C-alpha cells in the first residue's frame, strides 16, 4: 500500500508534468488530505469521491485529492497503476478548473449524468 507521503510525491510529480498555464488562478493549489469521502448520493456506501474542484469567494480555487478514498477504491493497485488513476483524477479536476475559468459547465453536467446513471442502475439492481 502506498503511504500518504508517497502519494504526495506521486501527486507532485504528476502536477510538475502539467503545463504551468493550467495553474492560473488555482490560488489554493492541489491539496492531498487523508480523509475518505463517501459521495452523499452513494447507494450501499460504494461510491467514493476521489477528488474535488473547489471555487469559493473567500477560499479561492483549489483541488482536493482524498487519500483515504483512493486507498479504499484502489489500495490494492501497484504504485504505477495507482499513479495512472491519480493522474486521471487530477486531469479531471483540472478540466473543472479550466471550464470554470471559461464559464463552461460541460464536465459538471457529465458528472451529474454519470451520477444519475449510477443511481438508476443501483435502483434497478435493487428491484431484481
Language model features with spans:
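Auxiliary, metal-adjacent structural segments of Zn-dependent hydrolase domains
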Residues: 12-69
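Post-HEXXH active-site segment of zinc metalloproteases
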Residues: 68-70, 79-88, 100-128
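Long, hydrophobic, amphipathic alpha-helical segments used as structural scaffolds
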Residues: 22, 26, 98-105
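N-terminal small/polar-rich segments of proteins
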Residues: 1-14
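Generic alpha-helix signal with a bias toward terminal, lower-confidence helices
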Residues: 30, 34, 38, 42-45, ...
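Mid-chain, well-packed structural core segment of small domains
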Residues: 51-90, 94
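Amphipathic alpha-helical interface segments used for dimerization/assembly
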Residues: 15, 90, 94-99
